[in-house]
A protein has these predicted regions:
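Compact, glycine-rich, soluble single-domain proteins
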Residues: 1-85
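Helix-rich terminal scaffold detector
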Residues: 75, 85-122
Length: 122
């Protein structure tokens, strides 16, 4: 049982053997999140190709009032298997420019030919 605000790491009883060049990503189930406030703390959880242990999922109950019970066999997460490319990083003195530059969080979509909605009413 996950009490409100509690987190716990749950064993799935499953293990996989991914081939080199692939990774698996453990993600929340949308129904658990929408209906019960259950999510995965480190979403997505990454499973590397070399890992051979039991898949475990750290769940968090974000509901402020209701506990959530988990039984053996419950579907608590989804697994996405995806090909991955190993990047090789090269140190450089500077980076080429881009339309976004160094603008950070919340800046995507601004200054790209969109009209300003500042002062507009809905």
């Amino acid at each position: 049982v996950l009490a409100p605000g509690e987190r716990a790491t749950i064993g799935t009883g499953c293990a996989i053997a991914l081939p080199d060049g692939f990774a698996a990503f453990v993600v929340p189930r949308s129904g658990l999140a929408a209906k019960h406030g259950i999510t995965i703390v480190n979403s997505p959880g990454t499973v590397d190709a070399g890992y051979r242990g039991e898949l475990r999922v750290t769940l968090l109950n974000t509901d402020a009032h209701e506990s959530y019970s988990i039984a053996v066999g419950d579907r608590i997460a989804q697994l996405i298997i995806w090909p991955v490319v190993r990047a090789r990083f090269v140190p450089v003195e500077s980076l080429p420019g881009s339309h976004r530059g160094q603008r950070g969080f919340g800046s995507t979509g601004y200054g790209e030919g969109l009209e300003s909605t500042e002062g507009a009413s809905a």
